[in-house]
């Protein structure tokens, strides 16, 4: 339990660093989202711990929003208990590589598509 809690805190801290750093963000003048699918893919493929944390934290947040936010009203996704953020990262990388035409989309959209393709109810 303690190991999972510490891992969660690490990912949360790294996600906060990402949000406050402003790197690889899309200008709010051009779009209403902050992270493109291509930018998220770059983070997810990185060997740097901070960027890996940004990736996994973002994916965990989107996955949580499916259940606690409005996304659950529009899509039917049932992520099995026990799926790790590392597994979510692997799913996103393979899906994003398969659909490069969506790189300029908001990252949550492409990842939600990946979740729906793998974990449809």
Outline where the language-model segments fall:
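Bacterial N-terminal signal peptides that target proteins for export
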Residues: 2-12
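Bacterial N-terminal signal peptides
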Residues: 10-22
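Sec/Tat signal peptide C-region and signal peptidase I cleavage site
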Residues: 23-29
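Short N-proximal segments of mature Sec-exported proteins
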Residues: 32-94
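Short, compact, well-ordered microdomains
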Residues: 93-121
């Amino acid at each position: 339990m303690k190991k999972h809690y510490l891992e969660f805190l690490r990912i949360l801290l790294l996600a906060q660093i990402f949000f406050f750093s402003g790197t690889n963000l899309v200008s709010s003048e051009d779009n209403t989202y902050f992270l493109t699918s291509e930018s998220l893919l770059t983070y997810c493929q990185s060997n740097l711990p901070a960027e890996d944390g940004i990736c996994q934290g973002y994916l965990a947040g989107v996955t949580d929003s499916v259940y606690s936010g409005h996304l659950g009203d529009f899509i039917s996704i049932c992520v099995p208990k026990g799926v790790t953020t590392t597994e979510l990262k692997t799913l996103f990388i393979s899906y994003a590589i398969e659909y490069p035409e969506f790189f300029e989309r908001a990252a949550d959209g492409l990842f939600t598509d990946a979740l729906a393709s793998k974990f449809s109810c």
